[in-house]
Swiss-Prot record:
Keywords: DNA damage, DNA recombination, DNA repair, Metal-binding, Zinc, Zinc-finger. May play a role in DNA repair. It seems to be involved in an RecBC-independent recombinational process of DNA repair. It may act with RecF and RecO. Residues 80-175 form the Toprim domain. NCBIfam families: recR. A zinc finger (C4-type) spans 57-72. One of its GO terms (molecular function) is zinc ion binding. HAMAP family: RecR (MF_00017). InterPro entries: DNA_Rcmb_RecR (IPR000093), Rcmb_RecR (IPR023627), Rcmb_RecR_Znf (IPR015967), TOPRIM_dom (IPR006171), TOPRIM_RecR (IPR034137). Belongs to the RecR family. One of its GO terms (biological process) is DNA recombination. It comes from Streptococcus pyogenes serotype M5 (strain Manfredo). The gene is recR. This is Recombination protein RecR.
Length: 198
């Protein structure tokens, strides 16, 4: 069935979001059309404000509205550890468990030869730069338990080991192929407590 152009454009916009197919995009579009003008205006304002006001921390790469982010400026955190994650959602997941008190580094992707992603395509050089001051003694690699996550963790280990930095990996309480952002707090807590050296 063909829809009027404004609805078709809205469906197309929603379908560009990850995990949103045409059916869900259509439902969202019709739901949006049914919202009050005030709610639609608030939604649009919030969307534009988030896009305009958020940036990536110049130190760790986390999503923030202040640069550097509140985690990087928190001097009460453990300065000897950096936990490396794939994206900003993983930082939020780790912060929820309130167990890890070190700093973070967000890669914004994983090494994935099948997808044409190499070490230069992720936020890895700035991690190496951060380690040059000698304060960090351990890097915890918390990439997802996928082939790309494993490839990335092994690459990080190979690069950092010669510098004498201990590189550990989250324990395997996480199922292979699972995403950190969807793991429950107990699983993440056990994964940090039982991490293994690479």
């Amino acid at each position: 069935m063909l829809y009027p152009t404004p609805i078709a454009k809205l469906i197309d916009s929603y379908s560009k979001l990850p995990g949103i197919g045409i059916k869900t995009a259509t439902r969202l579009a019709f739901y949006t059309i049914g919202m009050s003008n005030e709610d639609v205006n608030d939604f649009a304002k919030n969307l534009l404000a988030a896009k305009r006001e958020l940036t990536y921390c110049s130190i760790c790469g986390n999503l923030t509205d202040d640069d550097p982010c509140h985690i990087c400026t928190d001097t009460s955190r453990d300065q000897t550890t950096i936990l490396v994650v794939e994206d900003a959602k993983d930082v939020s997941a780790m912060e929820k468990i309130q167990e890890y008190r070190g700093y973070y580094h967000v890669l914004h992707g994983l090494i994935s030869p099948m997808n044409g992603m190499g070490p230069d395509d992720i936020n890895l050089k700035s991690l190496i730069t951060r380690l040059m001051d000698g304060k960090v003694s351990e890097v915890i690699v918390a990439t997802n338990a996928t082939a790309d996550g494993e490839a990335t963790s092994m690459y990080i280990s190979r690069v950092l080991k010669p510098a004498g930095i201990k590189v550990t990996r989250l324990a395997r309480g996480l199922a292979v192929g699972s995403d950190i952002e969807y793991a429950d707090e107990v699983t993440l807590l056990r994964a940090i407590e039982n991490r293994t050296e690479l």
